[in-house]
Amino acid sequence: MNSTAANVKPEPGLYGPDAAASPAIARYLIQGPSPLSIGLVVLIGAISSFLLQQFLKPAVNPLSPKFTSNTWPWLGSLGMMIGHWTFWKSCIKESKTGQFSFWLGRTHVVGLSGPDARKMFFEHPALDLHKATDLTPLGVNFWPIHAIFTPRDEKFQKSTYWLRTLTHLMKTPNMERCLPGVIQDARTGLEALKRDTPSGIINTPKVWPVVFKQTARVFMADDVTDDPKLWATTLGAIDTILHTFSPFNTLLPWIPEPSMIRRRMARRALLRVSRGIVRDRHASPKSASKNDAVQSLINLGDPDDNISEFMINAAFVGVVNAHVIFPQLLNALAVHLDWQDKVYKEVTEVADQHCKEQCLPLVDKLFHIPLSAWENSFPNAALMMEEISRIWTCFPTARFNTLYESIPIPGTSEVIPARTHAIYNSTEIHFNPKLYDRPASFRPDRFAPESQKTWDKEPHGLNTWGTGQRLCSGMRWAKLQQNILMAVALSLYRLEKCDKDGKPDPSAYEKQQAMDGDLDEEVAFVLPECFVKLIPRE
């Protein structure tokens, strides 16, 4: 034995019977652990339990469709968030039934495909749209779901404040009230394009503020559209919500991710605007005579909180598709000059029919067109809008099974489990060659009255304006808006397709015949650049 080691003695008071001689240990033995150390242990334990809960997947119904292999650890199916159509096709390819399961974070989702499952998805009354908004990156800004989306009676899903108010604002007197203002909004915004861009070369997705100003006038208040300060705040907030995205908003919503923080702040800014307007209206005796959307709801005696929430939700929902459709209509009109000429001819004929002062510029004549003519006198514009909507409304749509029991998936032995999300991708129908001849081609005449409705070969073969249990409640305004925007644009300009330098784009027509080249967004929630040259009309 090493003699040096053998001669080493333990330090008194630290080991053995002399341990109590250490003052620190003695205090610990007598007093117990400090509150700080207990707190740290509890905090670490709580964080560990929370993380464990977040990363462990809950049990699922064994009759659920088989899970896809396209899955990342912890995150789930990231492909669904960054390339939805590529992901969808790969999942269907490896599924024996065409149905599949996948994870978004800890959320179990059932993916559906095929005519029978599609019919069930769109028609089953227990599959709720609003309760599935936590699943979509655009919907999480408005979570938890406000009471305006809750039915007064579970048996009548359409008995919500949201739908009742939309129906009220879609009535003819309200549409007629808004008509002069929204025509002027379109004129002011589109005339400014040439003033702000002397070359006349515009990137069409950048014109969306014109679309939003009209939407704000219809669903919010004249204060928003007419007050520069309120307009700037509201426009900036909507811009953030529309164009700020991260897949983690849905996959790991508990992480304070920067884009989520910006979106939450934007939503709060919208609430401050809407609540401030409602508060000011109550404070001013003269407000009762105002004639806009918010005042009509106040005059009906609606609760202030409901009005404020409706304003910001309607402003967002009203622009989310419209700000995509109009830029693509401008592009299509610039590429297909034959269709541009058809729509322009409609505009001039309708304007001349309703305006007695023939010496006025065409854009001034538009103010004389009555609501009924705006809605019914532009058949070629309607065909273009339907075709653009078919092409550009290709995305996953979510529902939530509100039942505490499973819903069988027709034609399979599989189910959508109780309290579980389901998703259907409308790209499956809108680019289906069985339903549409040459679906990747821009062909508005496929929707002409004399054409065969090939999409009726299968249930719900067209989903441009909703279908089944969920039709677009704001469809009347949406169609009217696009007619007005096209008419004002063509009354001011002739449109020519070009590149970013203003040179003619020789491949533009070919691109319009192969619009299925990439059905996944290049950048999520950001439209690809699309340049058009504005040539002022004489």
Curated annotation (Swiss-Prot):
Tell me which EC number(s) this protein carries.
1.14.13.-
Subcellular locations according to the entry: Membrane
Q: In which pathway does it act?
A: Pigment biosynthesis
Question: InterPro entries per the record?
Answer: Cyt_P450, Cyt_P450_E_grp-I, Cyt_P450_sf
Q: Which UniProt keywords apply?
A: Glycoprotein, Heme, Iron, Membrane, Metal-binding, Monooxygenase, Oxidoreductase, Transmembrane, Transmembrane helix
| Entry's Gene Ontology BP terms | sterol metabolic process
**Positions contributing to heme binding:** 472
| Residue positions with a glycan | 306, 425
Where is it mostly found? Answer: membrane
Query: What is the role of this chain?
Result: Cytochrome P450 monooxygenase; part of the gene cluster that mediates the biosynthesis of the bianthraquinone cladofulvin, a conidial pigment not required for virulence but that plays a role in fitness and resistance to environmental stresses including UV light and low-temperature stress. The pathway begins with the synthesis of atrochrysone thioester by the polyketide synthase (PKS) claG. The atrochrysone carboxyl ACP thioesterase claF then breaks the thioester bond and releases the atrochrysone carboxylic acid from claG.
Which family, according to UniProt? Belongs to the cytochrome P450 family.
- Could you identify this protein by its name? Cytochrome P450 monooxygenase claM
The protein's organism comes out as: Passalora fulva (Tomato leaf mold)
